[in-house]
């Protein structure tokens, strides 16, 4: 399958979101246990039609969202995106499939997307929110240079400048 590569890191190709990966997207977002770490708790599956609309909307908007594909195998790793972006700041979001976790892809992806955001998109500030009990993600974000700047019972807010 032909996917347009936007940028790369050592082990990851960052490609445009595409309907070719729809099955992988659905598997990832409907893994209720895994998705609880980055979207929150829910019990219903996301239907295929809704996910197709999401992909098409992101493509039409030319949104800065990328699917991550393993260079060596071509397997889907997850998605990473900038949300609520203005000319100098954006919120970072990342989702990695359960089977590709604990393999170093999170740190590599966060480092690469931060570099892309600052160098290619001209961002001066990148921020994110993470659940306080998601210690693996917090550790990765800290390793990539993010620092906590606020906290509530539900979220920790981190940024890199």
Give names to the regions the model predicted.
Residues 96, 102-117, 138-143:
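Conserved acetyl-CoA-binding loop-helix of GNAT-fold acetyltransferases
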Residues 124-138, 143-161:
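C-terminal "cap" of GNAT-fold acetyltransferases
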Residues 21, 33, 100, 104, ...:
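Conserved functional loop/turn residues at catalytic and ligand-binding sites
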Residues 20, 87, 135-136:
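Short alpha-helical
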Residues 41-93, 97-99, 152:
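Acetyl-CoA-dependent GNAT
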Residues 1-52:
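A short, well-structured alpha-helix characteristic of acyl/acetyltransferase catalytic modules
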Residues 24, 91, 95, 136:
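Amphipathic alpha-helical recognition patches that constitute DNA-binding helices
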Residues 74, 104, 134:
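Conserved G/P- and acidic residue-centered "switch" motifs that form tight phosphate/ATP-binding loops
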């Amino acid at each position: 399958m032909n996917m347009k590569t936007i940028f790369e890191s050592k082990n990851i190709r960052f490609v445009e979101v595409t309907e070719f990966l729809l099955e992988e997207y659905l598997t990832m977002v409907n893994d209720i246990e895994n998705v609880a770490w980055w979207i929150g708790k829910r019990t219903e599956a996301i239907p295929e039609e809704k996910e197709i609309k999401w992909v098409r909307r992101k493509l039409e908007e030319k949104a800065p969202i990328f699917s991550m594909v393993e260079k060596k195998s071509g397997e889907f790793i997850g998605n990473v995106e900038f949300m609520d972006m203005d000319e100098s700041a954006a919120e970072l979001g990342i989702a990695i499939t359960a089977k590709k976790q604990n393999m170093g892809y999170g740190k590599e992806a966060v480092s690469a997307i931060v570099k892309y955001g600052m160098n290619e998109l001209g961002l001066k500030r990148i921020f994110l929110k993470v659940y306080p009990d998601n210690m693996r993600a917090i550790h990765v974000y800290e390793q990539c240079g993010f620092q906590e700047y606020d906290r509530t019972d539900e979220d920790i807010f981190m940024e890199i400048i």
